[in-house]
A protein has these predicted regions:
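Active-site gating/metal-coordination segments in enzymes
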Residues: 70-167, 174, 218-222
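Mid-to-C-terminal alpha-helical segments outside catalytic/metal-binding sites
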Residues: 1-5, 14-57, 62, 240-241, ...
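Short, electropositive alpha-helical surface patch
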Residues: 78-87, 176-185, 238-244, 267-276
């Protein structure tokens, strides 16, 4: 079996759910604005049904739909919809933990069938969430003070997915050390690019996280992060370093599809792992299936 731990899909724009993210959307629709990433090779409305069809062609059994911020970033309607509608899809949503009703929002969305956790876009300015990346922002440290929210997340078994840029890993370390009972997933292995070699500072920070058994690292976004063509050989020693530090039980493959569709096929987002010569078949089975299910309690 194979689970894609990081995929995206989204519904059409409407009055209730307008497309508003200027970095993603475009066209003349009444509810859309900005410049769509025309490089995508998938349909502009890439629904759960289309994702499932692509999964079937790749023989991916299940996928985690990470909320796609094409609408206002806290609008989780479509992620919840597909998680409730399809047994093969689960969902990760985004909530403003600083909102007055944040706990109520969390309790409501976690009650939906198939929702397994929340995502923090710690690499984005809070007022430009998912519209711009900025390695200098530090609102994650302010989020530490939202104690009631994180207590609710722990009570609800909400896995906390954190997307961050390498210079912000010290914030992630402080956050995790403050709330050691939560379950954590580090998206895109903290966006470490292929030209950064193991031993550099980002890897030292990740090594600190490896000491926490409740932290899993996603081996996702590799097509974007690599400076080379398939099979992305500059990322191979990153895989081996993660394997050594975290063990295969805490590394999980994710495609970041269809964000990668401008440079790779869905198949290539997975099969590059077969070219990491030192990985055993058992390692691959853990990384592409067992590790994530075990980590978030899906097994």
């Amino acid at each position: 079996m194979v689970i894609d731990t990081h995929a995206h899909c989204w519904g059409p724009p409407s009055e209730a759910h307008p497309w508003t993210n200027s970095q993603i959307v475009g066209g003349s629709d009444e509810y859309a604005s900005g410049d769509f990433l025309q490089d995508f090779t998938v349909d502009l409305v890439y629904t759960g049904e289309k994702l499932l069809a692509d999964m079937d062609r790749l023989v991916v059994e299940d996928a985690v739909v990470v909320g796609y911020p094409i609408c206002p970033w806290t609008d989780n309607w479509y992620t919840v919809k597909v998680a409730e509608e399809y047994d093969r899809l689960t969902g990760v949503v985004m909530i403003d933990q600083f909102a007055d009703d944040a706990v109520d929002q969390l309790e409501d969305v976690m009650s939906a069938e198939g929702i397994i956790g929340i995502r923090l876009g710690a690499g984005c300015p809070y007022d430009r969430m998912w519209q711009r990346f900025d390695p200098t922002v530090d609102w994650l440290l302010d989020a530490i003070d939202e104690t009631e929210f994180w207590a609710a997340a722990e009570a609800l078994d909400a896995a906390v997915h954190i997307w961050t840029l390498p210079p912000q890993l010290d914030q992630v370390v402080e956050f995790i050390e403050t709330y050691p009972e939560l379950t954590y997933v580090i998206d895109h292995h903290s966006y470490i690019r292929g030209d950064v070699r193991p031993g550099a500072e980002p890897f030292e920070q990740l090594a600190t996280l490896a000491a926490h058994d409740n932290v899993l690292v996603k081996l996702s976004g590799v097509v974007t992060l690599s400076d080379e063509e398939y099979p992305y050989s500059d990322k191979h020693d990153h895989v081996l370093w993660l394997l050594d530090q975290f063990g295969r039980e805490r590394i999980a493959w994710g495609s970041d599809w269809p964000n990668e569709s401008n440079d790779a096929t869905y198949l290539e987002t997975l099969t590059w792992l077969n070219h990491v010569d030192e990985l055993s078949q058992s390692d691959l089975e853990w990384i592409t299936d067992r590790s994530f299910r075990q980590h978030v309690g899906m097994d």
